[in-house]
Amino acid sequence: MTKLGFLRLSYEKQDTLLKLLILSMAAVLSFSTRLFAVLRFESVIHEFDPYFNYRTTRFLAEEGFYKFHNWFDDRAWYPLGRIIGGTIYPGLMITSAAIYHVLHFFHITIDIRNVCVFLAPLFSSFTTIVTYHLTKELKDAGAGLLAAAMIAVVPGYISRSVAGSYDNEGIAIFCMLLTYYMWIKAVKTGSIYWAAKCALAYFYMVSSWGGYVFLINLIPLHVLVLMLTGRFSHRIYVAYCTVYCLGTILSMQISFVGFQPVLSSEHMAAFGVFGLCQIHAFVDYLRSKLNPQQFEVLFRSVISLVGFVLLTIGALLMLTGKISPWTGRFYSLLDPSYAKNNIPIIASVSEHQPTTWSSYYFDLQLLVFMFPVGLYYCFSNLSDARIFIIMYGVTSMYFSAVMVRLMLVLAPVMCILSGIGVSQVLSTYMKNLDISRQDKKSKKQQDSTYPIKNEVASGMILVMAFFLITYTFHSTWVTSEAYSSPSIVLSARGGDGSRIIFDDFREAYYWLRHNTPEDAKVMSWWDYGYQITAMANRTILVDNNTWNNTHISRVGQAMASTEEKAYEIMRELDVSYVLVIFGGLTGYSSDDINKFLWMVRIGGSTDTGKHIKEHDYYTPTGEFRVDREGSPVLLNCLMYKMCYYRFGQVYTEAKRPLGYDRVRNAEIGNKDFELDVLEEAYTTEHWLVRIYKVKDLDNRGLSRT
């Protein structure tokens, strides 16, 4: 007996050790696969928004939380400025600053920039661990390990968590899955302890990302479905009431959120379900005290009265403005055409565009096919927790189709349900595999179809193993080629296969920092505002915060106008330098000419820009062209002239004419012109960034020198 007990304990230890080893390998893989950019380039911040996050984190680490919370940034949105503490989700910055100070406390000296660069890969490892525990609650440890391995390399999540991608989503996905895990534990146990931990995880989520609104609507929806399916119980009541009350109070401590949880339409579903919980509990109490006839009469009366009162109060609050309406971004989730028709500034952001079919396969690959299998398993074995994951999967699938950015929210549930699906398929077919010769003989005697079953099972397991291997290779390739290139440092392959580096952005920002006055104001399109402020340390007019559409529209009007009209706007805004991005020489397609129509649309969306009409920039046949057939309005606007100044004297390709644009594949139509109100200040090595100085009026204000 003692020997058998020892063997059993030893097996359990081996099982635990094996699980720990696999999970640790998945976590290490999750971290290491996100380091391509650091190995290929250097430790550098990516994209645009991360530069603002890095700048604010550096300020927090150096100056402390009090100054950070009360920081008024006079470098942004000139002449308006921006209050930082009350307009951001501080969770990301506080997390990085805390890690930075803890490491320095133990005399591990690391620059705050490197903390920011490696934070997202670190939290992706934590996400792997949370995914394991969450999936384990839904099925078993095997499914959890598969889901953890899948989320470690899934491109849909890697796209926002590579080293250098210092954005809110880098830690928010971990916070979201942690909240879901705590919620499922609270639902299963009905424990205030787990519900309180869920509320704390939700608070961390709120402090980190505006996407918390998805979470605070999904959990109430789960409770509502449990009510409708007759699964509502004391456990659900305790869990939801604790999470809602404590979570709402905690979330209101974030300055940027404030009273929104009790005043905005996005949060009213959670409040409504909280009220329904009280009504449901009260009805259950009445049912226990009254006979069926009395209860039915009272129930109908109470429901009718409560429904009428709630609708009346809700309508009055909406009409009086006490409850704010849905914001443009949320309207665009329900109606994908809303932003395009009403708010061009939202529609102009590439990550707000609808998702293409190819993006699903590109970002998810095998998961697209295994997701329905996991969904089927959950439907076949319904429980409170599985109903939640079904709803998470279905709702995130819809929202990801509306907005490509929300592929990030879909990727984790794809991994969870695919892990469940693969685990179920493998466990089903592995039951038919023979383990020993004795088992094989007995099975042959009992089942004449055994050999066929054995071969089919072996084939299915091999096929599944092949698909999992191809998923790994695909994910690694996508990570390396598509998601590990920092936008601030570009690269291309030369004719001999060598890598060519285009470091024009940092070159331009370095020039601005050292060759312009400290108080110089730089006008550019809003995409580059955060980078200019963080790297050049110069005042900008607009940036990626896009909180003031009128101000952005004014910049768009300047870009879309003639030099004379643009000069009036630039003098009005006290502009010293103008910066544009031009890819005609190198073939960089994300330049300002390709973004120009959005400048026209946004510029013409306000009263001061009513004279700017989009159709004026097209040819009579409705084409947007930069060659001789192009619209005269386009060929003479400020943006065109700044991009193509002196370009008509340049050869870009062999056997092509002077001034051949490699992005638009056309010879430019307006070559021989001079600038009247601007003078070229600096053009980078590959012409990617061009900086112009605004000429001053003479003393009498009559002519420019």
UniProtKB/Swiss-Prot annotation:
EC number: 2.4.99.18
GO molecular function (one): metal ion binding
Subcellular location: Endoplasmic reticulum membrane
GO terms under biological process: co-translational protein modification; post-translational protein modification; protein N-linked glycosylation via asparagine
Signal peptide: none
Pfam families: AglB_core-like, STT3
Membrane topology: Multi-pass membrane protein
GO CC terms of this entry: oligosaccharyltransferase complex
Transmembrane segments: 18-38, 120-138, 141-158, 170-189, 192-206, 212-228, 234-259, 268-287, 301-321, 357-379, 386-402, 407-428, 454-473
Sequence positions that bind dolichyl diphosphooligosaccharide: 405, 530
Reactions performed catalytically: a di-trans,poly-cis-dolichyl diphosphooligosaccharide + L-asparaginyl-[protein] = N(4)-(oligosaccharide-(1->4)-N-acetyl-beta-D-glucosaminyl-(1->4)-N-acetyl-beta-D-glucosaminyl)-L-asparaginyl-[protein] + a di-trans,poly-cis-dolichyl diphosphate + H(+)
Annotated site (Important for catalytic activity): 160
Short motif DXD motif 1, span: 47-49
UniProt-annotated glycosylation sites, renumbered to this chain: 537, 544, 548
Chain location of the short sequence motif DXD motif 2 per the record: 167-169
Residue ranges that the UniProt entry lists as topological domain Cytoplasmic: 1-17, 139-140, 190-191, 229-233, 288-300, 380-385, 429-453
Record: residues binding Mn(2+): 49, 167, 169
Chain span(s) of sequence motif WWDYG motif: 525-529
DK motif (motif): residue ranges: 592-599
Record family assignment: Belongs to the STT3 family.
Comment text on domains: Despite low primary sequence conservation between eukaryotic catalytic subunits and bacterial and archaeal single subunit OSTs (ssOST), structural comparison revealed several common motifs at spatially equivalent positions, like the DXD motif 1 on the external loop 1 and the DXD motif 2 on the external loop 2 involved in binding of the metal ion cofactor and the carboxamide group of the acceptor asparagine, the conserved Glu residue of the TIXE/SVSE motif on the external loop 5 involved in catalysis, as well as the WWDYG and the DK/MI motifs in the globular domain that define the binding pocket for the +2 Ser/Thr of the acceptor sequon.
Protein's name in the database: Dolichyl-diphosphooligosaccharide--protein glycosyltransferase subunit STT3A
Source organism of this protein record: Bos taurus (Bovine)
Name of the gene this protein is made from: STT3A
